[in-house]
């Protein structure tokens, strides 16, 4: 859990903004959303494999588009 110490003469809004930023960097919200419901190990593997395929296809399409522009 990120900790933010409020400095002397620092407005609350600024400290809150720093806290939100540190939570975002630590990935607290994404972790909470991920753990909100139980996901079976097989479903987790399927989701990760699908994400890997999607990343791979995206990378391939970028490379093909780059090659088309060169000629």
Curated annotation (Swiss-Prot):
A Pfam family: Ribosomal_S21
InterPro entries: Ribosomal_bS21 (IPR001911), Ribosomal_bS21_CS (IPR018278), Ribosomal_bS21_sf (IPR038380)
Keywords: Ribonucleoprotein, Ribosomal protein
Region (Disordered): 37-71
Keyword Transmembrane: no
GO cellular component, one term: ribosome
GO biological process, alphabetically ordered: translation
Compositional bias per record (Basic residues), positions renumbered to this chain: 45-71
Gene Ontology MF terms in the entry: structural constituent of ribosome
Family recorded in the similarity comment: Belongs to the bacterial ribosomal protein bS21 family.
Full protein name: Small ribosomal subunit protein bS21
Organism placement in taxonomy: Bacteria, Pseudomonadati, Pseudomonadota, Gammaproteobacteria, Chromatiales
């Amino acid at each position: 859990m990120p900790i933010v110490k409020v400095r002397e003469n620092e407005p609350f809004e600024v400290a809150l903004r720093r806290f939100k930023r540190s939570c975002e960097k630590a990935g607290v919200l994404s972790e909470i959303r991920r753990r909100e419901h139980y996901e079976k190990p097989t479903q987790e593997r399927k989701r990760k494999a699908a994400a890997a395929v999607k990343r791979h296809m995206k990378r391939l399409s970028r490379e093909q588009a780059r090659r088309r522009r060169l000629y």
